[in-house]
Amino acid sequence: MKRMICLILALAMIVTLAACGGKEEETIVTTATEVSVETDAVVAPETTEAPTEEVTETTEAPNTVMPVEIVLLDNESCTFSVGPISVSEIAGMQVNVTCVNKTQESLDFSWNNVSVCGMMYDPNWAVTVPAGETLESKVEIDTYALETMGIYAVEEITFQLCVTSNENWMDAPYVKEYFTVYPTGRSADTVVYPVREAVASEVVLVDNENLTFIAEYAEQQDLYYVVRCYITNKTQGTLMTSWENVTVNGLDVDPFWTALVAPGKSAYAEVKFADSDLKAQGIEIVDNISFDLTAYDDADWTELVRVPVSYVPVDEAAVG
């Protein structure tokens, strides 16, 4: 009997030990799995690269010179307003404009015959506004380009606002009218126009009651022989100036040049002769340029100026 009891006790101990051994092995596996997961999530791969720093671009805050919006035109077909106007060293001057189309067709709004402080300057601005809609835009003025003309403060902007049908180009314009804006608060009596400094090599080609035309100098540039000119329109209308019947050293070479100058304004212009055209005529040095200097009223094409000119460049420059 005692032997039976001993056998039973021995079997019970073996079963207990086997059960304990199974639990320990399962715990180890579970623990190893947990350690593996935690290691993958926390430990980052080693790297020798330095941490990157965010590079932020510094932008200059524009200086608002005219903070208000001014309605220049408001009729049954459209409304046009300017402002605010801001200027910065990087972006130049930006004139905010608002165009309202009140018609049943698309309209083209544009600035033509633009001048800044009395000097012609073309910002190449035009927009199309769908029927019944309003469009906001910006007219950008390159202040660096103005500085080459002696303008260091934009005190006056004059432009002809043209509003025309985008669908029927032959129709009469809705608007074709001049406006003047004074961004810095000056007036027509107080605005300061730049004074042109005379150039030693300049030649006055025409100076009468309608027009002053000066050839400042001639020089060789990339691919072109260039005559830089200064023009003043003394009339009350827009002038279309041009060179006609042009010869260089007695040979036909046409630069196909024209320039529009608004009433009472001045302009710098470059008359360009292509090197290829000059070389085709065997011209290596420009000794003389002859032409008819003409000026027409842009409204009705009345000829106001026609003067035969023979221009001899002061500084010789080899073509090309």
Segments the model singles out, each with a brief description of its role:
Residues 89-96, 221-228:
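Short, solvent-exposed loop/turn segments enriched in Ser/Thr/Gly
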Residues 16-19:
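C-terminal motif of bacterial Sec signal peptides marking the signal peptidase cleavage site
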Residues 92, 119-179, 184-186, 224, ...:
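Short, solvent-exposed, Trp/other aromatic-anchored flexible loops in extracytoplasmic proteins
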Residues 54-70, 163-203, 315:
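A eukaryote-biased signal for short, well-structured alpha-helical docking elements
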Residues 23-78, 193, 199-206:
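N-terminal, intrinsically disordered, polar/charged segments of Gram-positive cell-envelope systems
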Residues 2-10, 14:
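Sec-dependent signal peptide recognition
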Residues 99-104, 230-236:
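Asparagine-centered strand-capping/turn motif at beta-strand->loop junctions
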Residues 105-112, 237-245, 284:
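Short, hydrophobic/aromatic beta-strand segments
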